[in-house]
From Swiss-Prot:
Keywords: Cell inner membrane, Cell membrane, Membrane, Transmembrane, Transmembrane helix, Transport. GO terms for molecular function: xenobiotic transmembrane transporter activity. Part of a tripartite efflux system composed of MdtA, MdtB and MdtC. MdtC forms a heteromultimer with MdtB. The chain crosses the membrane at residues 15-35, 333-353, 360-380, 387-407, 431-451, 463-483, 528-548, 853-873, 897-917, 953-973, 984-1004. It comes from Salmonella paratyphi C (strain RKS4594). It is a multi-pass membrane protein. It is found in: Cell inner membrane. Belongs to the resistance-nodulation-cell division (RND) (TC 2.A.6) family. MdtC subfamily. This is Multidrug resistance protein MdtC. The keyword Cell inner membrane applies.
Length: 1026
């Protein structure tokens, strides 16, 4: 009582406290970073190693395995996967959430150093690592095009100058340059000319390497001067290499230009990049795992004028893709939704109270509570994101509830003729405990969320804390500022025997009278209500089992990502044509704004595309509808498939896959994996619950298998090393020397001229110089036959792995897809030697499914404990919690009605309903208990009077919460996929709960009261006179 009086009778102090909360909130709001979602990126590090010309199996056994054994000892590694292809190996390390990325990087470098002695010789460089997730979509893509510059020269400028500058920007984790490769001097050998001159390929290689050296020459000095010695020991251009003498034939010099074409070209000619219809160099920028995407993009954009200033006039630099506009638009939509929710809630209050002065009080209390929350968010290191702003939107209904309960009770005393300050003090005292109970029990709902681990826990933590802080501030405001404003702003009125009967007042009176009549009937037919209550409990269980489930709603971020998978024996020239064909199909779609793509590198039969859609206001279709439309057109392209998926703000795992979800097959036997993977793939491809089924196990590439006759080789004086060196020199794009320039280092690349290696007959032209100096054709000691070979070898941990990726057809949920996969694996009878498990987002979904019921039960148990402590009763909390089944039924039915699967966002809605709907029961139970204690009423009389007396505040608080959530349901535009499931769940639960709990709660109250009396009679002891 004295606590409330302190603030009611000291208005200046109360106003200044509220002003201080508001000012701190405004300052926090200005300092808060902006993001699409809370920070939930796993720390990921990618290790890369190369050995040009090495087969995928060689890379896996000699490079990947030693590195994996060393890297696998690092603490905190969640998952280690590797992919080895022609000449390259890439290992992805995903760490625990609590692992510091910089500390993990130091451990990775130490592990690489430890494995260095086990790696093969001939590697052009040591393995390197990058602190970025290669499976993440780039946050920004820049393109370089030019009418006069070659692709190699553009690539050199991009990688040497632009990429280095961009990588220094805060938040940038990796700048991947694609579309070509570094400039190089390429030596294309003529096998017939070499044979005629009697020159071996090794001799050419050694001559070039010896002619291009960079060694210190020292200095000469006398007593006065010092001269630095400089020689022309380096050859830097193709023109300088052409006259190089590589051999003498009968005293005549054989020059390099006589037996080879020497050109200024690029290191790897099997690379191509495009933007729309033009050749381009792509700079794909990814952020650090812990970086903020908006701040990073803003930093890049701020650097663009400087970058453009350093670019020659012949180069055009453009932004091909930027993830930030849709994020900003989504947050703007949430902010508008928040403003609409506040306005609707204030309107509800005005309609019920029909007083401008009375409405002004919650109109002040709500902004103070919401704005003050920003200060706490800043102190906690949170951001302004979709979830935290949705928490504030939902909090609008909660924070006004506290003010409504206090305000309505004070208004009731004023209508009875009590003086304002006395009414404020008396009214606050009566409902103070009720408001505290409602707020504490609501905050208790979120305690299990704060203890939840993994990605879901990280994702929901900001939502839970933000909402809890807003409720806490609202509690303080409703018990301090609200009664003070009521005491000083509202006026008492003469007691009336009847309330006004105009407009909404007449409707409320009619509703209250109708409710009273129906409640009397219900209290006389409690068994029927009991059956209805038990029916809702059973219906809850059935609906939860039956409803389709997913991890997170599919977002429309305005960006699509596509992976091209062509025939495994396709050539680079044909693959480049496929890229152009696919880009034309997509570019012609009316919803597409920009298309970029590239192909080549170590995987000739694959490519990547990034598609920017037009803003939501300029297109009618969602991203998924556009994918469905394009899928039909793309399927007509022969020899290759393009798999499209909408880029999501959450992508789990480090695997690069051509679809959103993955199912991984593991085995310690590569033979068993290769036997069962095609069978499983065929069975899964036939499932209607899956779309775009594809795989990364590519073991049908074309291979030419050479079989040496070792006896013949020994007789001819040829060893295996010389034969292998011949093949590497001829067909491996072998980097044989380095050209040092001020800005970068470039390579001399040697191979047989492509004109002489267009078919298998090229092998017949190859020869080896034996120990006697004679040229021995390869066909003398080797036979060759075509065979199948893997284009890549994949590992997870140290086991052979194959990942099957899939998307979901429209109308299919992730739960339906995972159930179909598990059922199919059981039907196939896959042996124990081949293990299957979901990975990435599908794996997190499985883990979340297992913990959802536990989380809901934990929330209910926590609320029960808090209510039990507050009421000092085991029974009354059960009465209050009896409101939950009806809310659950309403929420699940609403999701079914809107064809929305049960996701993590819907789970948040269920948790919120646990806190919202029990408020009705708290208000009823509080007044019923008070009526029994002070009024001497029977339980039936007390609960009946409490229901009628609290009908108006119950309607006000329910409608306030409902109207606070309604804008989430009706919202469109960017980010609506996240907001709508939350609004649907809350609105559906509130409507059903309001219809049923007004009747079930009084019946449950009386049931437990009778049960308590029976229990007390059985345990009562007879009085014994002594």
């Amino acid at each position: 009582m004295r606590f409330f009086a302190l603030f009611i009778y000291r208005p200046v102090a109360t106003i200044l406290i509220a002003a201080a909360i508001t000012l701190c909130g405004i300052l926090g709001f200005r300092l808060l970073p902006v993001a699409p979602l809370p920070q939930v990126d796993f720390p990921v590090i990618m290790v890369s190693a190369s050995l040009p010309g090495a087969s995928p199996e060689t890379m896996a056994s000699s490079v990947a395995t030693p590195l994996e054994r060393s890297l696998g000892r690092i603490a905190g590694v969640n998952e280690m996967t590797s992919s080895s292809s022609l000449g390259s190996t890439r290992i992805i390390l995903e760490f625990n959430f609590d692992r510091d990325i910089n500390g993990a990087a130091r451990d990775v470098q130490a592990a690489i150093n430890a494995a260095q002695s086990l790696l093969p010789g001939g590697m052009p460089s040591r393995p390197t690592y990058r602190k970025a997730n290669p499976s993440d979509a780039p946050i920004m893509i820049l393109t370089l095009t030019s009418e006069s510059w070659s692709q190699g020269k553009l690539y050199d400028f991009a990688s040497t100058q632009l990429a280095q500058t961009i990588a220094q920007i805060d938040g940038v984790g990796d700048v991947d340059v694609g579309g070509s490769s570094l400039p190089a001097v390429r030596v294309g050998l003529n096998p017939q000319a070499l044979f005629n001159q009697g020159v071996s390929l090794d001799e050419v290689r050694e001559a070039i390497d010896s002619a291009n050296v960079r060694r210190p020459q020292g200095a000469i000095e006398d007593s006065v001067h010092r001269w630095q010695i400089q020689t022309n020991d380096e050859l830097k251009t193709a023109a300088e290499y052409q006259p190089l003498i590589i051999h003498y034939n009968n005293g005549a010099a054989v020059r390099l230009g006589d037996v080879a074409s020497v050109t200024d070209s690029v290191q790897d000619v099997r690379n191509a990049g495009m933007t729309n219809a033009k050749p381009a160099i792509l700079l794909m920028i990814r952020k650090l795992p812990e970086a903020n995407i908006i701040q990073t993009v803003d930093g890049i954009r701020a650097k663009l004028p400087e970058l453009r200033a350093m670019i020659p006039a012949a180069i055009d630099l453009q932004i091909a893709q930027d993830r930030s506009p849709t994020i900003r638009a989504s947050l703007q939509e949430v902010e508008e939704t928040l403003a609409i929710s506040v306005a609707l809630v204030i309107m509800v209050v005005f309609l019920f109270l029909r007083s401008g002065r009375a409405t002004l009080i919650p109109a002040v209390a709500v902004p103070v509570s919401l704005i003050g929350t920003f200060a706490a968010m800043y102190l906690c290191g949170f951001s302004l994101n979709n979830l935290s702003l949705m928490a504030l939107t939902i909090a609008t209904g909660f924070v006004v509830d506290d003010a409504i309960v206090v305000l309505e009770n004070i208004a009731r005393h004023l209508e009875a003729g009590m003086k304002p300050l006395q009414a404020a003090l008396q009214g606050t005292r009566e409902v103070g405990f009720t408001v505290i109970s409602m707020s504490l029990s609501l905050v208790a709902v979120f305690l299990p969320l704060l203890l939840m681990g993994g990605l879901p826990g990280r994702l929901l933590r900001e939502f839970a804390v933000t909402l809890s802080v807003a409720i806490g501030i609202s509690l303080v405001v409703s018990l301090t500022l609200t009664p003070m404003m009521c005491g000083w702003m509202l006026k008492s009125s003469k007691p009336r025997t009847q309330p006004r009967k105009r407009g909404v007042g007449r409707l409320l009176v009619a509703l209250q009278q109708g409710y009273g009549t129906s409640l009397k009937w219900v209290l006389n037919h409690t068994r029927l209500v009991g059956v209805v209550f038990l029916g809702t409990v059973a219906l809850n269980i059935w609906l939860y089992i039956a409803i389709p489930k997913t991890f997170f709603p599919e977002q429309d971020t305005g960006v699509l990502m596509g992976g091209i998978q062509a025939d495994q024996s396709i050539s680079f020239q044909a693959m480049r044509g496929k890229l152009q064909d696919f880009m034309k199909i997509i570019r012609d779609d009316p919803a597409v704004n920009n298309v970029t793509g590239f192909t080549g590198g170590s995987r000739v039969n694959s490519g990547m595309m990034f598609i920017t859609l037009k803003p939501r206001g300029e297109r009618k279709e969602t991203a998924q509808q556009i994918i469905d439309r394009l899928r039909v057109k793309l399927a007509k392209e022969p020899g290759a498939r393009l798999f499209l998926m909408a880029v999501q703000d959450i992508r789990v795992g480090g695997r690069q896959a051509n679809a959103s979800y993955q199912y991984t097959l593991l085995s310690d036997s590569l033979a068993a994996l290769r036997e069962w993977e095609p069978k499983i793939r065929k069975a899964l491809s036939a499932l209607p619950q899956l779309a775009d089924v594809n795989f990364d196990q590519q073991d049908n590439g074309a291979e030419m298998n050479l079989i040496y006759d070792r006896d013949t080789m020994s007789r001819l004086g040829i060893d295996v090393q010389a034969a292998n060196s011949l093949l590497n020199n001829a067909f491996g794009q072998r980097q044989i020397s380095t050209i040092y320039q001020p800005m970068n280092q470039y390579k001399v690349v040697m191979e047989v001229d492509p004109r002489y290696s267009q078919d298998i007959s090229a092998l017949e032209k190859m020869f080896v110089i034996n120990r006697d100096g004679k040229a021995i054709p390869l066909s003398y000691f080797a036979q060759w036959r075509p065979a199948n070979a893997p284009l890549s070898v994949n590992h997870q941990g140290l086991s052979a792995a194959s990942t099957i990726a899939f998307n979901l057809p429209t109308g299919t949920s992730l739960s339906q897809a995972t159930e179909a996969i598990n059922r199919t694996m059981t039907q196939l009878g896959v042996p124990p030697t081949v293990r299957g498990s979901f990975s990435g987002t599908a794996q997190v979904f499985q883990q979340t499914m297992n913990s959802q019921l536990i989380l809901i039960v934990a929330a209910i148990a926590t609320v029960y404990i808090v209510l039990g402590i507050l009421y000092e009763s085991y029974v009354h909390p059960l009465t209050i919690l009896s409101t939950l089944p009806s809310a659950g039924v309403g929420a699940l039915l609403a999701l079914e009605l809107f064809n929305a699967p049960f996701s993590l966002i819907a789970l948040i809605g269920i948790m919120l309903l646990i806190g919202i709907v029990k408020k009705n029961a708290i208000m009823m139970v509080d007044f019923a208990l008070e009526a029994q204690r002070s009024g001497g009423l029977t339980p039936a009389q007390a609960i009946f009077q409490a229901c009628l007396l609290r009908f108006r505040p119950i309607m006000m608080t329910t409608l306030a919460a409902l109207f606070g959530a309604l804008p989430l349901v009706l919202s469109g535009g960017d980010g609506s996929e996240l907001r709508q499931p939350l609004g649907i769940t809350i609105v559906g639960g509130l409507v059903m709960s309001q219809l049923l709990t007004l009747y079930t709660t009084p019946v449950v109250y009386l049931f437990f009261d009778r049960l308590r009396l029976r229990f007390s009679r059985k345990n009562s002891k007879p009085v014994v006179e002594i």
